[in-house]
Amino acid sequence: MKGSKSEVQGMVLTTGVKGLDELLGGGVARRVILQVYGPFATGKTTFAMQVGLLNEGKVAYVDTEGGFSPERLAQMARSRGLDPEKALSKFIIFEPMDLNEQRRVISKLKTIVDEKFSLVVVDSLTAHYRAEGSKNYGELAKQLQVLQWLARRKNVAVIVINQVYHDSNSNSLRPIAEHTLGYRTKDILRFEKLRVGVRLAVLERHRFRPEGGIVYFKITDKGLEDSK
């Protein structure tokens, strides 16, 4: 028996972009890890911030790169007629400075995240691994296991931002630790930069949506919007 429309809506968080919501089968799903990867300045952080801004519930935001901007979040809120202070108060920010701190922070989320939270973001999961030249993907897998536990036990959506590298074999940009993250992330979005302000989202993997779907979106003061 199919659930009601409200039940279905309650299991996803809107992205605020109609095209992206449709691409993801309604929005960012709770109880699942969504991986978003792509080159620098493609809108990945703005995407994660916007999902937190537009949905009820607190957000646990693990910022490993210093990319989270309170000023940008306030701008997005004001541009949408929302209270900037109220928007900022929803976000609980963690700033691990190295791999060890990142491991401790993610583990600590098991006791911090409760029913008041709707979203957990790690932006990005692989930055410190890349910076420190670590190939210890076993530790990365353990952190993903904790994030998967949070998604399922705490009924939250989890967004993991990932960086890219140039793969000489395929002559293309691929996500770091692709196989390790791919094992735990059921839904995968790739962001690409087309021209100033305009971006492309490609659905590389999904639990029930067809792979390869694409959506164009733009970056504005509001955050991300459909590109017409």
Swiss-Prot record:
Magnesium among keywords: no
PROSITE patterns noted in UniProt: RECA_2
Protein residues bound to ATP: G38, P39, F40, A41, T42, G43, K44, T45
A Pfam entry, by short name: Rad51
MF terms (GO), sorted A to Z: ATP binding; ATP hydrolysis activity; ATP-dependent DNA damage sensor activity; damaged DNA binding
SMART domains, per database record: AAA
The entry's keywords: ATP-binding, DNA damage, DNA recombination, DNA-binding, Nucleotide-binding
Family matches, as SUPFAM superfamilies: P-loop containing nucleoside triphosphate hydrolases
The keyword Disulfide bond is annotated on this UniProt entry: no
Single GO biological process annotation from the record: DNA recombination
PANTHER family: DNA REPAIR AND RECOMBINATION PROTEIN RADB, RECA/RAD51/RADA DNA STRAND-PAIRING FAMILY MEMBER
Function: Involved in DNA repair and in homologous recombination. May regulate the cleavage reactions of the branch-structured DNA. Has a very weak ATPase activity that is not stimulated by DNA. Binds DNA but does not promote DNA strands exchange.
Similarity remark: Belongs to the eukaryotic RecA-like protein family. RadB subfamily.
HAMAP family: RadB
Protein name: DNA repair and recombination protein RadB
Gene name per UniProt: radB
